[in-house]
Curated annotation (Swiss-Prot):
Main location: membrane
Membrane-protein topology: Multi-pass membrane protein
Taxonomic classification: Eukaryota, Fungi, Dikarya, Ascomycota, Pezizomycotina
Keyword Glycoprotein appears in the UniProt entry: yes
Gene Ontology terms: biological process: amino acid transmembrane export from vacuole; autophagy
Gene of this entry: atg22-2
Protein role: Vacuolar effluxer which mediate the efflux of amino acids resulting from autophagic degradation. The release of autophagic amino acids allows the maintenance of protein synthesis and viability during nitrogen starvation.
InterPro entries (UniProt xref): Atg22, Atg22-like, ATG22/LtaA_families, MFS_dom, MFS_trans_sf
Organism: Emericella nidulans (strain FGSC A4 / ATCC 38163 / CBS 112.46 / NRRL 194 / M139) (Aspergillus nidulans)
Highest taxon above the source species: Eukaryota
CDD domains: MFS_Atg22_like
Assigned protein family: Belongs to the ATG22 family.
Name by which UniProt lists this protein: Autophagy-related protein 22-2
Transmembrane segments: 42-62, 112-132, 159-179, 181-201, 271-291, 305-325, 377-397, 415-435, 448-468, 480-500, 525-545, 548-568
Residues that carry a glycan: N90, N443
Pfam families associated with the record: ATG22
Length: 593
């Protein structure tokens, strides 16, 4: 396997011809191995917080912090502690003995407290994406914002060591900040992908010669190799656009699947897979840490302490790999942001900040107007709205179903999470192989993922068939049945995450990557409210979580015709044509300004 020292230095190809400059000061240096691994490093850093924090231990920590401060709704006895009833803290208390906590004059269920916190976090995250992410397309903001979100987010996870039950509300504040930084950083990270692909030597050769001369991304034993990266030289962060290599304008790819899309898909898939690898590793370490600390006297007297140690570990991991990203990933500056110059005085700085936020909201509106002129972008975003809603709804419903109807323990739910995560890791590596083996276009691969995803709700609905219900098995009637479905969920999610992100990247007008990925993320987060709300209403109406599978089955099918209609090559050419014909020229850089 290649060593870190080998990865950190990759000689530049002597015959590499840089692409044409879209604006003054653009860095068109060839993409090297170190820069690609710097991009991977942040995914490895933040995916751990997404899976181990947001997806597993943060909800448990919030609920337990509130529970230790709460009381039973009817008897007003403590939920935990020596005076608590034996069944109060283990999930077997009757409904009228729910654990509640006083907050702002109300008595809130401790589980609902965690749900409300994450709902607020998603809302704040969406506002932050709009306010700041569009600025990443300008000057050196792209890398600066990525690192700022990474270090602030990791700090919120580590600060949970200081949160004790009497100040459980501060834990909610940390969650809101952490989730906001997580989502915002991924938007900025995604905006690097089209730029890295555009400056890759193999893509430039394929464009210049009108060939599909791509990297051979493969695995030989344990060695990961990309053929054209073996001889590159990474010239460092200070490599500028000027140089001895002639700047040339790429020609249009002649194939139905562009070199950019193929390489983008492969890099994206590997990035998702490496993120899942890191998440599984830290999740296993976290479970071992929880098991060890829970046996100590301190862990028994302070139930949240083991969970807070896990969040400390997650935060340290996030910060450490963000440092690696800061060393290896180039800034890739955008064009100057005209009219926004930081002032010297305090008041002037506030005025500049307000102008920046106002500009970001205006930029979002401009992004929407530009997107509406690109048919493939509109169709894809409509499909992505439904796909992301389905993923979020299936995840939430599955956990709720496992706890309430299959009665899985917390450890079993954790193992279910690891199963899905490991499957997602395998899926991220598997889908590119499947796509190459059967010569599938990106949208066809997404359609195959959606078809497999439909297995989950269909299997859950089998229990509505009388003779299957009488068997007492199949249709999610036994706890073990949810684990194979967890594998399906993971494999499909890994494919959808990488292929949807990569396909959308090819539809974006060059120079507007961060703004369009902010719209991509806003579509994702905006849809996350819809499905869970409808499933919740169905549960209230029927008293059964299983009824949610009916809605999920329909929801998963809805985006299929839209995905089928997306033509990636036509969308890419439309985006390039829009940039070339944009007024005020400089190739329309900065959202076609």
């Amino acid at each position: 396997m290649a060593s870190f020292s080998q990865l950190a230095s990759s000689p530049e190809e002597p015959d590499f011809e840089r692409r044409f400059l879209r604006y003054r000061g653009e860095d068109t240096s060839p993409t090297g191995r170190r820069e690609i691994w710097g991009w991977y490093a942040y995914g490895v850093a933040a995916e751990v917080f997404a899976v181990c924090g947001v997806g597993s231990f943060l909800p448990l920590t919030l609920e337990q912090l509130a529970r230790e401060q709460g009381f039973l709704s009817s008897s007003h006895l403590p939920c935990v502690g020596p005076d608590a009833p034996p069944a109060a803290g283990n999930g077997t208390a009757p409904a009228n003995e729910a654990c509640v906590v006083p907050l702002m004059g109300l008595e809130i269920n401790t589980a609902s407290f965690a749900m409300y916190t994450f709902s607020l976090a998603v809302l704040i995250q969406a506002l932050t994406l709009v306010s700041f992410s569009a600025l990443a397309d300008y000057e050196n903001n792209r890398k600066a914002l990525l690192l700022a979100f990474g270090f602030i987010g990791s700090a919120t996870s580590m600060l949970f060591m200081l949160i004790v039950p009497p100040v459980f509300v501060l834990g909610a504040l940390l969650v809101v900040i952490g989730v906001t930084c997580l989502g915002s950083s991924f938007v900025v990270l995604n905006s690097f992908l089209p730029i890295l692909v555009a400056n890759d030597p193999s893509v430039q050769r394929a464009s210049n010669k009108n060939k599909d001369d791509l990297h051979d991304l493969h695995t030989e034993g344990d060695e990961f190799s990309l053929r054209s990266w073996t001889d590159e030289e990474d010239t460092g962060d200070h490599a500028g656009p000027a140089g001895s290599k002639k700047a040339v304008e790429p020609e249009k790819a002649s194939s139905s699947t562009s070199p950019e899309l193929q390489l983008s898909t492969r890099i994206s898939s590997r990035g998702v897979g490496l993120g899942y690898c890191a998440a599984v590793l830290v999740q296993i370490l976290s479970i071992l840490l929880l098991f060890t600390l829970s046996k100590t006297s301190m862990g028994k007297s302070h139930p949240t302490l083991p969970l807070r140690f896990v969040l400390l570990l997650v935060g340290i991991w996030w910060a450490a790999f963000t440092v690696v990203c800061s060393r290896w990933l180039r800034s890739r500056p955008g064009p100057p942001l005209e009219g926004v110059t930081p002032g010297a005085g305090y008041r002037q700085k506030w005025r500049v900040w307000l102008r920046v936020v106002g500009f970001a909201w205006k930029s979002l509106w401009n992004t929407i107007k530009v997107a509406l002129r690109l048919r493939e972008v509109v169709v894809f975003l409509a499909a992505w709205f439904l796909i992301s809603d389905a993923i979020a709804t299936v995840s939430g419903t599955a956990i709720l179903f496992a706890r309430t109807e299959l009665h899985l323990s917390t450890v079993s739910v954790g193992l279910l999470s690891i199963t899905a995560t490991m499957s997602g890791m395998a899926g991220a590596f598997l889908w590119p192989i499947v796509a190459r083996r059967f010569a599938l276009a990106s949208n066809h691969t997404i359609l195959l993922c959606i078809a497999l995803f439909e297995i989950i709700p269909l299997y859950g609905m089998l229990a509505y068939i009388p003779f299957i219900r009488n068997w007492g098995v199949l249709g999610l009637q036994k706890p073990w049945e949810i684990f194979p479905l967890g594998i399906v969920h993971g494999v499909v999610s890994g494919g959808l995450a990488s292929y949807c992100r990569s396909l959308f990247g090819e539809l974006i007008p060059p120079g507007s990557e961060a703004a369009f990925y902010a719209l991509y993320a806003a579509t994702d987060k905006g849809s996350s409210f819809v499905g869970p709300a409808i499933v919740g209403a169905l549960i209230d109406a029927t008293g059964s979580v299983r009824s949610g599978f009916i809605f999920i089955g329909v929801l998963i099918l809805l985006p299929m015709p839209l995905v089928w209609l997306v033509n990636a090559e036509r969308g890419r050419q439309d985006a390039i044509a829009m940039v070339k014909h944009a007024p005020n020229s400089e190739e329309g850089e900065g959202l076609l300004r």
